[in-house]
Amino acid sequence: MKTIVRLFAILMVLISSVGFVGSAVAAELNPVDAKLTTEYGQKIDLNNEDVRGFRQLRGFYPNLAAKIIKYSPYDSVEEVLDIPGLSERQRQRLEANLDKFVVTPPSSELNEGGDRINPGLY
């Protein structure tokens, strides 16, 4: 009898673990996670980052970051230098940090609600 109970318990554990495999496969299909494995995960995306993402760069948060967001979307990283109303100092900061930016197509998953200035994270 004990052997039957043990076999039944092992069988139940094996059957219940099959559901976890399906969950792991579904998690791999997330488009945002897939994007993080590209250059987007290492650099600031000018078309998808909210204002808080620019805090890691000195002199960008919040004013210069807000200008960058206001005039997006961009087709290339260098296009950010054409923002109207940039001061000379802001232009210098942008030029010095061009290698820290990337441009990808705007994504609704990353811009939910369309508010990149105040994403509601407090």
From Swiss-Prot:
Pfam family, any one:
PsbU
Q: How does it assemble?
A: PSII is composed of 1 copy each of membrane proteins PsbA, PsbB, PsbC, PsbD, PsbE, PsbF, PsbH, PsbI, PsbJ, PsbK, PsbL, PsbM, PsbT, PsbX, PsbY, PsbZ, Psb30/Ycf12, peripheral proteins PsbO, CyanoQ (PsbQ), PsbU, PsbV and a large number of cofactors. It forms dimeric complexes.
Name of this protein: Photosystem II extrinsic protein U
Question: Which family would the database say this protein is a member of?
Answer: Belongs to the PsbU family.
Which N-terminal stretch is annotated as signal sequence?
A: 1-26
Q: What is its main location?
A: membrane
Provenance organism: Crocosphaera subtropica (strain ATCC 51142 / BH68) (Cyanothece sp. (strain ATCC 51142))
Keywords for this protein: Electron transport, Membrane, Photosynthesis, Photosystem II, Signal, Thylakoid, Transport
Function, as annotated? One of the extrinsic, lumenal subunits of photosystem II (PSII). PSII is a light-driven water plastoquinone oxidoreductase, using light energy to abstract electrons from H(2)O, generating a proton gradient subsequently used for ATP formation. The extrinsic proteins stabilize the structure of photosystem II oxygen-evolving complex (OEC), the ion environment of oxygen evolution and protect the OEC against heat-induced inactivation.
Q: How would you describe this protein's topology in the membrane?
A: Peripheral membrane protein
Cell compartments where the protein resides: Cellular thylakoid membrane
Q: Does the keyword Thylakoid apply?
A: yes
Organism superkingdom: Bacteria
The record's SUPFAM superfamilies line, in alphabetical order, gives:
PsbU/PolX domain-like
Q: Name one GO biological process term.
A: photosynthesis
Kindly list the GO CC terms recorded for this protein.
extrinsic component of membrane; photosystem II oxygen evolving complex; plasma membrane-derived thylakoid membrane
